[in-house]
Amino acid sequence: MITPRLLWLLIFLSAFTGCTTQPVPQAPDPETILQAIPPADSAKYQHIRDMKKWRNPYLIVRADGVVLFDSADSAEILVKPEDLLPALAKMPASYWPYGRVVAAQENGVRGSEQDGVAIRRNKGIVGGLLQGAHIAVEWVPAA
């Protein structure tokens, strides 16, 4: 015979186990998303001399981070170097007509020697991140 106390315990346990959530699948990491973009096709961009015609992501390495220039919106998005790959991974496939390649340049304006050091440090970090994600970089001379 089931006692009322045991009955309540069984009801509580069945309600508790029925309310447990299933684990949420992890979203793919930025590198995985970026690998879905075809490799860079230099035949599509090697003839470009005026960078205003560049249609892939364009980066400007600054002392305080990296600017991701969104040509579709004419917007500049400042990100930390370590947040660059997630920001690139959020861009739609239509932003990558040349394949997995970005144009990048150093900010030509330096207020101090520390700015130059910070820009060189950020350039190294960005270069390493992009190389690790198999994204080609077309370095453009600073204006």
Regions found by a protein language model. Give the residues of each.
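C-terminal motif of bacterial Sec signal peptides marking the signal peptidase cleavage site
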Residues: A15-G18
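Long, low-hydrophobicity, acidic/polar, solvent-exposed interaction domains
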Residues: T20-A143
